[in-house]
């Protein structure tokens, strides 16, 4: 047996004909075992137990005679999840290094399996599984680069995506060929003759994990029997959720989101582990499952990512060789979620981020009905469902919550889902139901705290929002400057509420003085923190944003000659931050009206200057808040008369842009929001007009601190409109 593994690791190079049938079978089962261990380890991270997962990988590597490829990938996936959940430089660097190692190991393992002609699947050629591990490593590595929100890193990521794409094309050709072969009578005959679900009768056995008929000697080999039994047992436990130490998931399965549903329980609980999905197939070979789910996830994410890349770096797409189809990409990611493994878990996390995350990939105001595709097979998810998955997404999340009860990551996703539905109080109640100090993964701990802080801000509970945001300083290394600035802006809003008389009562003067002091210290101190914590060796986009804002405040202080620093802060800065995190789409009428009051009624020396740039921000935010409250025509009028004339003119039927630099995020955003008004006012008849505004938004784009974030939102909306024109 070790002759095969020596060949794979370069210690020897026997010809394929030199390998005995028994050695080949042992190798195939050992590889299936190693892949099952890797899948189990990666599931631990989905249950907030990354350390146990990493230890499992290390222990298996120390005892397994197999190669290290899938172990390196699994470690890279765990580190990738930790990195993208926390965006901390050291964690991202570590994940990048591990994924780069997995890329190289995958290429070597694939080449050697091809050379030795070791076929581990009844469907695919030798080495296909390592083509998938290579693709997965490349894709995750590229995503780390894209998440930097840097144009340079984004361009580098495209080259890595190209590698993943070309490998995926090779695998897809093999999958398509295998699909045709699966339908043939010859293949069905071979399957019936050579494989079945794991069966041990006396001293003979067969296994789906072995893609050929065993010899009589192999059927009676106890070592092979034990290894095949172990692989089957590992797979069965994983599919039933019995592999990571939790009680049966069926007892925790709910029918709705929200803290209230947590209280509902059955008096009768089963101790038997059951499959939660009809899609789970215990009799599917581990390698085939890994290949199918991996290709669906990787090619799906790849297409969605490429479809979202903003025009600022879109010119480089030609290097990749194709333009992604968001629709097809989403379908593939949805397919991956049907598999009970890490690919399904990552796919679901990606979908939840896409539909319910803070970056408006699917703006709820752009509720254009999707056209049905009558030519689509009934097994495929149609366009309306892709646009608004509704109960399907909820059910998938609730299943994950049941399978991984120890992970606050899935609780976070549930809170985001509630928040998107405008159920802000329920979202906070759910986040309050867990003590963040008990969460093992500090990245998830930080996400929980940050989500709670921002949700409290959307509810206008600014004091508690500030206090919660400041907790981030002790648990996250991402951006101490932003956390401090955000908290300072919250205290500023509390101070202004007392100034406006919205808040009053006992100890009002004392509280007002406290909020004033906290706001002054935190807002202006935040700028001094920039540069101490860097992301990918660069200053974070939002750090650059707050630097520019604090500089503005200081300039106004010189203009108004006031001894009070807070007099130099014009339009409510917390309302800018609310926009960046999609907060207005989550507010109820109560919060929207409070925001409107803050934006339009508060006065101080800087606001009284009626500085054109400050007025531009105020009018833009006011217009979209009015739209959310149903005053669409009033909001559109403000945008048309007060904002857009400062950004462009039409001369000889051609658009001429008035380039401004004071608040660069505002200008393309104004065109984007105007497109939304066209849709809201005119419906389907306004789509061509909306499309024109979105083109203008793209054309006004430039490389500024939030260009990637704003650009992706504009691109997503433009594609959505183009699908319906």
From Swiss-Prot:
Self-association state and partner proteins as the record states: Interacts with lipid droplet proteins.
Gene Ontology cellular-component annotations: cytosol; mitochondrial outer membrane; nucleus
Family the entry assigns: Belongs to the IML2 family.
Location within or outside the cell: Cytoplasm; Nucleus
Pfam families recorded: Iml2-TPR_39
Protein known as: Inclusion body clearance protein IML2
Swiss-Prot/TrEMBL keywords: Cytoplasm, Nucleus, Phosphoprotein
Biological role: Inclusion body (IB) resident protein that interacts strongly with lipid droplet (LD) proteins. Involved in LD-mediated IB clearing after protein folding stress, probably by enabling access to the IBs of an LD-stored soluble sterol derivative that acts as a chaperone in inclusion clearing.
């Amino acid at each position: 047996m070790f002759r095969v593994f020596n060949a794979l690791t370069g210690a020897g190079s026997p010809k394929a004909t030199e390998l005995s049938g028994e050695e080949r079978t042992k190798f195939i089962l050992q590889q299936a075992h190693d892949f099952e261990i890797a899948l189990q380890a990666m599931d631990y991270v989905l249950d907030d137990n990354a350390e146990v997962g990493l230890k499992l990988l290390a222990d298996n590597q120390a005892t397994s005679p197999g190669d290290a490829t899938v172990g390196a990938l699994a470690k890279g996936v765990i580190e990738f999840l930790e990195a993208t959940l926390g965006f901390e430089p050291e964690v991202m660097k570590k994940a990048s290094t591990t994924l780069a190692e997995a890329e190289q190991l995958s290429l070597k393992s694939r080449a050697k399996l091809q050379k030795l002609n070791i076929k581990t699947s009844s469907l695919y050629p030798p080495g296909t599984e390592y083509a998938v591990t290579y693709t997965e490593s490349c894709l995750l590595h590229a995503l780390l680069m894209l998440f930097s929100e840097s144009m340079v890193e984004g361009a580098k990521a495209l080259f890595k995506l190209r590698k993943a794409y070309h490998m995926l094309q090779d695998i897809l050709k093999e999958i398509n060929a295998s699909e045709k072969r699966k339908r043939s009578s010859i293949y069905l005959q071979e399957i019936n003759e050579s494989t079945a679900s794991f069966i041990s009768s006396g001293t003979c056995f067969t296994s789906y994990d072995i893609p050929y008929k065993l010899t009589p000697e192999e059927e009676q080999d106890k070592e092979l029997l034990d290894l095949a039994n172990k692989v089957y047992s590992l797979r069965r436990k994983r599919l039933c959720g019995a592999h990571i130490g939790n009680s049966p998931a069926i007892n925790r399965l709910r029918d709705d989101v929200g803290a209230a549903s947590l209280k509902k329980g059955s008096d009768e609980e089963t101790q038997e582990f059951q499959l939660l999905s009809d899609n789970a197939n215990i009799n599917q070979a581990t390698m085939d499952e890994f290949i199918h789910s991996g290709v669906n996830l990787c090619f799906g994410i790849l297409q969605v990512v490429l479809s979202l890349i903003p025009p600022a770096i879109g010119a480089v797409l030609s290097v990749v060789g194709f333009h992604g189809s968001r629709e097809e990409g989403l379908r593939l990611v949805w397919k991956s979620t049907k598999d009970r493994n890490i690919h399904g878990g990552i796919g679901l996390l990606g979908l939840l981020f896409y539909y319910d995350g803070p970056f408006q990939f699917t703006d709820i105001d752009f509720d254009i009905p999707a056209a049905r595709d009558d030519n689509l097979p009934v097994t495929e998810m149609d366009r309306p469902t892709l646009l608004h998955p509704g109960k399907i997404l909820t059910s998938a999340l609730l299943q994950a919550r049941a399978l991984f009860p120890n992970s606050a990551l899935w609780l976070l996703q549930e809170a985001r889902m509630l928040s998107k539905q405008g159920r802000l109080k329920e979202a906070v109640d759910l986040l309050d139901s867990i003590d963040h100090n008990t969460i093992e993964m500090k990245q998830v701990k930080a996400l929980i705290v940050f989500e709670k802080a921002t949700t409290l801000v959307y509810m206008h509970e600014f004091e508690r929002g500030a206090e919660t945001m400041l907790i981030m300083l002790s648990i996250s290394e991402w951006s101490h400057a932003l956390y401090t600035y955000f908290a300072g802006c919250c205290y500023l809003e509390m101070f202004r509420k007392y100034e406006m008389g919205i808040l009053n009562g006992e100890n009002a003067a004392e509280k007002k003085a406290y909020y004033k002091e906290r706001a002054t210290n935190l807002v202006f101190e935040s700028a001094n923190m920039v540069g101490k914590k860097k992301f990918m060796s660069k200053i974070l986009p939002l750090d650059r944003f707050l630097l520019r804002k604090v500089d503005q405040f200081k300039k106004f202080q010189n203009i108004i000659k006031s001894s009070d620093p807070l007099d130099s802060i014009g339009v409510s800065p917390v309302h800018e931050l609310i926009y960046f995190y999609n907060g207005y789409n989550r507010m109820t009428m109560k919060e929207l009206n409070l925001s409107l009051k803050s934006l339009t009624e508060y006065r101080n020396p800087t606001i009284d200057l009626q500085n054109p740039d400050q007025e531009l921000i105020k009018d833009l935010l006011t217009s979209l808040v009015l739209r959310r409250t149903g005053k669409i025509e009033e909001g559109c009028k403000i945008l048309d008369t007060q904002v857009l004339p400062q950004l462009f003119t039409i001369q000889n039927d051609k658009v001429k842009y008035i380039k401004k630099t004071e608040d660069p995020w505002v200008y393309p955003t104004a065109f984007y929001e105007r497109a939304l008004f066209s849709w809201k006012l005119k419906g389907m008849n306004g789509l061509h007009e909306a499309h024109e505004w979105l083109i203008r938004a793209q054309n006004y784009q430039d490389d500024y601190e939030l260009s990637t974030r704003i650009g992706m939102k504009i691109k997503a909306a433009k594609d959505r409109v183009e699908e319906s024109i």
